[in-house]
């Protein structure tokens, strides 16, 4: 189950983000590959340019487009997904 820590995104888009993260975790084990999968899915579905960070320990400070940001956990893995640029 996903635990959302911070969000500025429609409910539909939130569900898509969590779904993409679950799919990525099933397909890949390397965090860079997980992030790349999610980024590409969102670039396709919601037009570029999305950025995705996946990991167990990172800090962040980002600028994002309004209504295009989510930060959540699946287990012990954090996902930061946002659109900028």
From Swiss-Prot:
The gene coding this protein: dlc2
Gene3D superfamilies tied to this protein: Protein Inhibitor Of Neuronal Nitric Oxide Synthase (3.30.740.10)
Cell compartments where the protein resides: Cytoplasm, Cytoskeleton; Nucleus, Nuclear pore complex
Species name: Schizosaccharomyces pombe (strain 972 / ATCC 24843)
Record family assignment: Belongs to the dynein light chain family.
Cellular compartments per GO CC: cytoplasmic dynein complex; cytosol; meiotic spindle pole body; microtubule; nuclear periphery; nuclear pore; nucleus
InterPro entries attached to this UniProt entry: DLC_sf, Dynein_light_1/2_CS, Dynein_light_chain_typ-1/2
Superkingdom of the source species: Eukaryota
Record-given protein name: Dynein light chain 1, cytoplasmic
Primary site of residence: cytoplasm
């Amino acid at each position: 189950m996903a635990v959302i820590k911070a969000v500025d995104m429609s409910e539909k888009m939130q569900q898509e983000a969590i779904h993409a993260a679950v799919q990525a975790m099933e397909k890949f084990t390397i965090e860079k590959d997980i992030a790349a999968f999610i980024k590409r899915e969102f670039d396709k579905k919601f037009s570029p340019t999305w950025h995705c960070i996946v990991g167990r320990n990172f800090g962040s400070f980002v600028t994002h487009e309004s209504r295009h940001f989510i930060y959540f956990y699946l287990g012990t893995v954090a996902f930061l997904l946002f659109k900028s640029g």
